[in-house]
Amino acid sequence: SLTRYDDILAAYKDVRNFSSALGVSLYFGQPQPDRSGMGRTMILTDPPRHAKIRQVVSRRFTPRAVAAYEGRIRQIAADVIDSIAEQGGCDFVVDIAARLPTAAICEMMGIEREHWDLMFTIANQTVGRLDDEYAMGRSGRETMLDAQAQASEFFVKEAEKRRRNPTDDLISILVHGEAGDEPLTDAEVIANCWLLMLGGQETTRNAISGAMLALAQHPAERERFLVNPSAPAAIEEFLRWTSPVTHIMRTAMSDMRIRGETIRTGDRVVLWNAAANRDEARFDHPDTFDITRAPNEHLAFGYGEHFCLGAHLARLEMKVMFEELVRRVSDIEIAGPIERLRSNFVAGIKHMPVRFVSNALPEPKPVSAA
């Protein structure tokens, strides 16, 4: 395990000696046979193949492209909040934090509204494979494989629709895209559809939920935040503080020594993002939640070749959601026990009851999110 910021940063940069191809999480010790029909996602590939797959969809996630989505993202956030604002309270995770990113990525992928609940369920079972609520008596491996099988069945059908009738959504871009000078394989298309659907939901959902909890637990910072909920520094501190993806795993491709410890070829090396983001050698007072922290070069989105493709989208969704919450809800407080996700990979909250008082607003608009 690597826990120091500088060591983790160096490993992220060194794609020659630290491979992603043999797994990126601690869920399973060794790669397992795949019964889902999926190929390799871009996060399970090394250069040069990784960059070739990534460039197929990357233009939809540039800062300029993401900025063009802001109006729609803001409308979704407003609809979500308006739909529950008069209820007096809700499960913040399920009713608010999850609905914006689920709706946004599904719309970008061209997934019809009737299937959004399925996408939410598949995401929960994938990241919550070790959690009893989502495993429902199955082993973690079986829960994961069942989720993959559901996703594969769905995206095979969606990909076939795009082959017959190309569109402008992300699924169609993958179906008709070329990685370098050759098309993606059918299995790669399905795998990367699943990855976009999963990644598009989880990081933002957990960052929004974790940020809301942090604001509730730190009243002074909450008051500062309410004065300027659009401050970029606050979003970066939310990400550092919550570290939604706790670790990323790599496989050593050569013998090496790090801080006096020997790492052999084939050893699994775990990069603990959450520890790096609290490293006192990098951050002043790292255990202090400070929404004005600067600089704040956290590793919540990783670094280098595998830097999170959706980082700009996640930041925008967080910014818009909190701006709309501040505008539409005058007060929010935790109203009951918080249930955390059982996972060593995702720092997630499953359920967080809150109570709130709504600001006076026009009649709610029709709900357009999951």
What are these regions, as identified by a protein language model?
Residues S1-A370:
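Cytochrome P450
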